[in-house]
């Protein structure tokens, strides 16, 4: 499943390739949108929504999440509003930061996610090291974000350079 406008060679036999940009009506829904639509696993609604808003896309099933996860999601106008102003948005940022960690920690996160619910991610316990790591990375991120805000702008562009162990320029 893909959503980037690229030419892809004909797949091998028994390999199915779907790219919404190569359809009759090209569209750029994120992979998580299509995975959720194809799998149809209602228990993964929260995870699909996290993937979509993390990609800057507000899916049509966001209204359903409002009913099922009312304590984590509310009616929003944009994906970015959902990302920065809801608890599911916070979960999305936790997952995003977790993917930028060491490989061993990413593997632990994936094992944890196989049995986790949305609420498990926000719960502090020894099984969920993701939240602890998120808090550590988020503290550094917030300092860099504040530094970037105070840095000079030229029109709509912001030129900001930082160094260190984190690779979070897309988030900034």
Where are these regions (language model features)?
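Long, charge-rich alpha-helical interaction segments
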Residues: 78-133
